């Protein structure tokens, strides 16, 4: 599908209460190393109070009809993030990816906003969240492992034949990690908010669970 228009952070940021001192491309989307782009971004990061770093997987890294052979984001993006973190500790990462990725670099980000596959108007939506105009209320719909080797699929992919082997049985997703006591990067259902919530009057019945949910913060939010 071809979008009618595409908003970018660079285009939209002037509409928000952010004093932007500049933008830099930083890396090639196709994964090639480019020291000129990297140096330009690092120099700009050194001058900034806060860095908003947009990174993730492009349409060539994940797509219908093919399986990824690893869970890493392109190395040139990681190297840029690590280089900027050496000159500026206030990095807000805005991640775009349609599925779980390894995050050995997560400590380089003081905050991390996951946009998944945001679409043509995602830049404005991300800036709404970053500036507090909107409250992030999303929760991870999948577990983010520390590394690919920690996943139950690691031993059986790729298959030697044209078969996909599913050996998890009942232990799909978080059930596997909980049962096997495997440490994860971010658990299923993880997500932060600009407000806080209180659970009370918990009642467990044969048909389900009921409780009273109260927003105890100063901002509207969903839980």
Residue ranges and their predicted role:
Residues 1-223:
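C-terminal non-catalytic regions of proteins with extracellular/luminal or membrane-system context
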């Amino acid at each position: 599908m071809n979008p009618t228009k595409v908003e970018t952070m660079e285009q939209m940021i002037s509409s928000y209460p952010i004093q932007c001192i500049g933008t830099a491309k930083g890396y090639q989307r196709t994964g090639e190393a480019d020291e000129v782009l990297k140096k330009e971004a690092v120099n700009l990061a050194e001058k900034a109070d806060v860095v908003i770093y947009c990174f993730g997987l492009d349409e060539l890294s994940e797509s219908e009809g093919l399986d990824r052979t690893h869970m890493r984001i392109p190395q040139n993006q990681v190297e840029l993030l690590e280089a900027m973190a050496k000159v500026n500790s206030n990095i807000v990462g805005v991640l775009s990816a349609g599925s779980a990725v390894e995050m050995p670099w997560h400590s380089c980000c003081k905050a991390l906003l996951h946009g998944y596959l945001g679409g043509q108007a995602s830049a404005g939506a991300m800036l709404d969240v970053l500036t507090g105009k909107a409250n992030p209320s999303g929760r991870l719909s999948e577990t983010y492992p520390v590394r690919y080797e920690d996943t139950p699929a690691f031993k059986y992919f790729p298959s030697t034949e044209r078969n996909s082997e599913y050996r998890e049985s009942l232990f799909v997703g978080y059930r596997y990690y909980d049962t096997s006591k495997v440490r994860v990067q971010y658990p299923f259902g993880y997500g932060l908010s600009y407000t806080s919530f209180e659970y009370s009057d918990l009642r467990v019945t044969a048909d389900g669970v009921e409780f009273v949910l109260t927003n105890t913060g100063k901002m509207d939010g969903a839980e």
